[in-house]
Design a protein with these regions (language model features):
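Active-site/ligand-binding-proximal alpha/beta "capping" segment
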Residues: 163-201, 206, 215-218
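Short, hinge-like loop/turn segments at secondary-structure boundaries
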Residues: 121-125, 185, 236-237
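RNA substrate-binding interface of SAM-dependent RNA methyltransferases
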Residues: 70-168
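N-terminal positively charged helical leader segments and presequences
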Residues: 1-68
Length: 244
């Protein structure tokens, strides 16, 4: 069944209104007809609907069943990703959305090779947001994770400062028991910030700055993970702990 997102104000007592690019997708790409069923989510409720009317700029669907969204992790997770090379960011966004991340913040770190210019930055962000939406639909998410504009490392640490847990996977972190202890300490309703370095990793100064903000450097094991793998690994472990 096809999955679509709306804002809460687009849901009435007995019907929902779908607007924007999804209208064209429903009508001209999927070629759906009146009476066909779709799944619609407003971030907290999931609606089983049947298409009632197809207009030029709006699709109206009759609500047949309402249930609480159950696909979201009970803790809000924000991934701060050091800007990687090539198209790796697209893979990171797609897979981390599937694994339950709520926000992704691209971060310019000292060892980042890629430098986004101002003209390309917004176009990139829009593409990344579209990838997030597509992955959220595929995964049956209850919301579309936000892809933030590029931040400096200082800005990222400031944004993360109010989170209950700030985790920094680091290949030189000691105490192999730490990840289990730290992840098990995360409780439903708490917010978690995860910082992932770019291909070259973190500089020691960046780790020190993060620790000064309350972050805990953790190891992900005896093997060094690629930047596009590390965030997924932490999310998978967090998901296991939170949904156990």
């Amino acid at each position: 069944m096809y999955h679509f997102f709306i804002k809460p104000e687009q849901a009435a007592a007995h019907e929902v209104a779908i607007i924007g690019s999804d209208v064209n997708h429903i009508k001209n790409v999927l070629r759906m007809k009146v009476g066909e069923q779709i799944c619609v989510n407003d971030g907290s409720h999931e609606y089983l609907c049947s298409i009632a009317q197809l207009d030029a700029e709006e699709v109206t669907a009759k609500i047949e069943q309402v249930s609480e969204t159950t696909s979201e992790l009970p803790s809000r997770i924000v991934l701060f990703q050091g800007l990687p090379k090539a198209d790796k960011m697209e893979t990171i966004i797609q897979k981390c959305v599937e694994l339950g991340v709520h926000e992704i913040v691209p971060v310019q770190m000292k060892r980042c090779v890629v430098k986004l210019d101002c003209k390309k930055e917004e176009a990139k962000r829009k593409r990344w947001q579209a990838i997030s939406e597509s992955a959220a639909k595929q995964a049956g998410r209850g919301l579309i994770p936000d892809i933030h504009p590029l931040m400096t490392y200082k800005e990222a640490l400031l944004y993360a400062s109010d989170k209950e847990h700030i985790l920094v996977p680091f290949e030189h972190a000691e105490n192999m028991q730490a990840p289990r202890d730290v992840l098990s300490a995360v409780k439903p309703g708490e917010q978690v910030a995860i910082f992932i370095g770019p291909e070259g990793g973190f500089e020691d100064e960046e780790i020190a700055q993060a620790e000064n903000c309350g972050a805990q450097a953790i190891t992900l094991g005896r093997r060094i993970l690629r930047t596009e793998t590390a965030g997924m690994a932490v999310l998978a472990m967090l998901g296991y702990v939170l949904e156990e």
